[in-house]
Structures are given as structure tokens and as C-alpha cells.
Curated annotation (Swiss-Prot):
SUPFAM superfamilies documented for this protein: Tetrapyrrole methylase
Pathway: Protein modification; peptidyl-diphthamide biosynthesis
Gene Ontology BP annotations: methylation; protein histidyl modification to diphthamide
Source organism: Methanosphaera stadtmanae (strain ATCC 43021 / DSM 3091 / JCM 11832 / MCB-3)
Record key words, sorted: Methyltransferase, S-adenosyl-L-methionine, Transferase
E.C. code: 2.1.1.98
GO MF terms held by the record: diphthine synthase activity
Function: S-adenosyl-L-methionine-dependent methyltransferase that catalyzes the trimethylation of the amino group of the modified target histidine residue in translation elongation factor 2 (EF-2), to form an intermediate called diphthine. The three successive methylation reactions represent the second step of diphthamide biosynthesis.
Main enzyme class: transferase
Protein name (record): Diphthine synthase
NCBIfam families assigned to the protein according to its UniProt record, in alphabetical order: dph5 (TIGR00522)
InterPro entries recorded: 4pyrrol_Mease (IPR000878), 4pyrrol_Methylase_sf (IPR035996), 4pyrrole_Mease_sub1 (IPR014777), 4pyrrole_Mease_sub2 (IPR014776), Dphthn_synthase (IPR004551)
Reaction(s) this enzyme catalyzes, per UniProt: 2-[(3S)-amino-3-carboxypropyl]-L-histidyl-[translation elongation factor 2] + 3 S-adenosyl-L-methionine = diphthine-[translation elongation factor 2] + 3 S-adenosyl-L-homocysteine + 3 H(+)
Record note on quaternary structure: Homodimer.
Length: 263
């Protein structure tokens, strides 16, 4: 048996009761924290409560998947991730391979940024388009794909959830400020008015915590806001329903004057 279990957004306390019971029942737990990480707690606290062998995998271990598949053929195994299960391509590949090998599977979902970000900002979840990710740039690596996703979504009147790069093995997490600088640099190269300084954006930090940070405004203003500890993400709104506009004023501290065209 192979369980796919989402641990939730922020800390080890976010796991569902159903997920916790499943983890107590298995022979071994494999965890992956390179696509997302629980920033608000200590996973060791959960491990102590479970008293089950707990192995944290490297990226290449998940991409290979042979160890997990082989174990699940004869034992009850859990594959756990922060957030919701099966949100990454490599996780889906593992799920499909397990089914093709005749291994029994069960998915136990967890809270995710995909639902939390629209909720805490007051935006309607069904009005979001393609999600994109801003990566850490390198000497020969500066993709424009996040800019293109925002452009395409905006043309269709859809909001964009922008995830920010995570390099957990280096303890390196992109901030809202870094991502806005990245997108502004693309704008300076492309000059297509997709991400001008007066574009409204929403920065979010520590979603799932007791006191998440949600701050909106012009790009030029939000760039200078201190969002504190990671994890961070950004929403780039498109056309707003008046209820969404009212919510952004209250929930994201957006200046009412910036939203007057939607009220």
C-alpha cells in the first residue's frame, strides 16, 4: 500500500486527523521537502508522535522512485509532502507508476497555497489562470516564462498566482521583493506594459500561520514592504469583481483609490 499524504501549509500541526492516523499505521514514511517546506514548526515533533521510520528524500530519490515502489510492493508506505499531495509532476509520476505496478494507493489531501492564497486575499478562486513560478536567476538562466504567464492570464481577465523559488537544500527562499525585481527587470527588457510599476500586486507571506501577511498595492510600493519570514508568494490580479476589490481594501490593505474603477 502506498499513501500520498499532504502535511498542510505551515507546520506539523496542519496534517489532517485522517492523515495522522494513516501515518501511525504504516511501516515507513518517505518525505520530500524540496518543492515545499513546513516553515512554522519542527517536523521532528511529528516524527516523535508517530514512532515510525521517517526518511527524508533528495530530489533525485523521488525522480528515481525505485526505492519507494519496491518497498510499497510488500509494505505499507507513506509518501508525504508539505501542502497538498500530488501537486508536483514528480509526485504524479510516482502515483501513476504505483498504479501501473498494481500497488494499492490512497490519497489524503492537505491544505495548499493554491486554495489558501485566493482565500486570504479575498479573490475568487475560479478566476485564476495558469500558475507560474519565478526562479532564482543565474548567469545563463533568466527565463521570461513568469512574465508570459501573467501576460496571457491578464489578456483573459484572469488572476495569476506566482509561486517563488524554493531551494530548501540551500536554505534559500525567494522573497516577494526579489520576485518583483525579477519581473520588473523582464518588463524593462520587453517593454510590453505587462508589469509596469503601477501594476497592482498582492504579496503573501506565511500562509497557514496564525498571522499571515497579506499586502497589496502598486509594484513600486510593495517592492519596499518587509514581508518577513518565508514562504512567500504573489498574486497579480486582473479584472476585479467589486466584491474582490472591497476584499482587497480590507484584507490586503490596498489603497481604495487604486481600486476605484472596480467599485
Amino acid at each position: 500500500m502506498l499513501y500520498f499524504i499532504g502535511l498542510g501549509l505551515f507546520s506539523e500541526d496542519d496534517i489532517s486527523y485522517k492523515g495522522f492516523k494513516a501515518l501511525k499505521s504504516v511501516d515507513c514514511i518517505y518525505a520530500e521537502f524540496y518543492t515545499a517546506k513546513l516553515m512554522g514548526g519542527n517536523i521532528d515533533n511529528l516524527i516523535e508522535k508517530l514512532d515510525v521510520p521517517f526518511i527524508t528524500l533528495k530530489r533525485e530519490d523521488v525522480e528515481d522512485a525505485n526505492v519507494i515502489i519496491k518497498e510499497a510492493m510488500t509494505k505499507d508506505i507513506a509518501f508525504v509532502t508539505a501542502g497538498d499531495s500530488l501537486m508536483a509532476t514528480t509526485h504524479t509520476e510516482l502515483y501513476v507508476e504505483a498504479i501501473n505496478k498494481g500497488i494499492k494507493t490512497q490519497i489524503i489531501h492537505g491544505s495548499s497555497i493554491f486554495s489558501a492564497a485566493p482565500g486570504i486575499s479575498g479573490l475568487q478562486a475560479y478566476k485564476f489562470g495558469k500558475t507560474t513560478t519565478v526562479p532564482f536567476p543565474d548567469e545563463n538562466f533568466f527565463p521570461h516564462s513568469p512574465y508570459d504567464a501573467i501576460k496571457l492570464n491578464s489578456q483573459m481577465g484572469l488572476h495569476t498566482l506566482v509561486l517563488l523559488d524554493i531551494q530548501a537544500h540551500k536554505d534559500r527562499y525567494m522573497t516577494v521583493n526579489q520576485a518583483l525585481d525579477y519581473l520588473s527587470k523582464v518588463e524593462s527588457e520587453r517593454k510590453e506594459h505587462v508589469f509596469d510599476d503601477d501594476r497592482i500586486v498582492i504579496g503573501i507571506a506565511q500562509a497557514g500561520s496564525k498571522h499571515p501577511i497579506v499586502k497589496g498595492g502598486r509594484v513600486s510600493d510593495v517592492k519596499n514592504f518587509d514581508f518577513g519570514k518565508p514562504l512567500h508568494c504573489i498574486i497579480v490580479p486582473a479584472n476585479l469583481h467589486f466584491i474582490e476589490a472591497e476584499a482587497l481594501i480590507t484584507l490586503a490593505d490596498v489603497d481604495k483609490e487604486l481600486l476605484k474603477d472596480f467599485l
